[in-house]
Amino acid sequence: MKVLFVCKGNAERSMAAEALFNKLSKRNKASSAGYDVIGEKGEGKGPSEITSKLFEERGHDVSAHKRRHLTERMVRDADIVVLVASGDESRILPKWLIESGKTRVWTVHGNEHTREHHAARLEIIGGLVKDLVNEIG
């Protein structure tokens, strides 16, 4: 089964979910993308610095991650799409993402850029990923 995690910039939430899912799941594969990967947060850049450091402290190397812009094909190719949202993104999301029939929404509030807030979001995402792995393998 292919799981696609999506967030705005593919620098923290969706990237973290992808890395944790791929570490925990033995049968399934995850990837991630952002629906607004443009400008200085552009495609091909790595994860946020704080996120990289937090993962490194936990024994995970995410330095090879490169931000990717979400495409309709990515959604078509996925069996499950998980939007790791920070709030009400529904008004700015592509229609084809919402109407795919594959999309689940995990709301992980907060856009603060402190180490403590990043760590708290990673803990929440980690719990949600564990639940998904327990559900699908």
Where are each of the predicted segments found?
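Mid-chain, well-packed structural core segment of small domains
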Residues: 65-96
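Conserved active-site segments centered on acidic
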Residues: 1-71
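Short glycine/proline-enriched coil/turn segments at helix->beta-strand junctions
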Residues: 25-29, 77, 99-102
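Generic alpha-helical secondary structure signal
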Residues: 49, 73-76, 116-123
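Structural signal for conserved beta-strand scaffold positions within catalytic alpha/beta enzyme cores
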Residues: 32, 83, 104-107
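N-terminal/domain-start segments enriched in small and hydrophobic, helix-friendly residues
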Residues: 1-5, 75-76, 126-134
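Phosphate-binding/catalytic loops
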Residues: 89-137
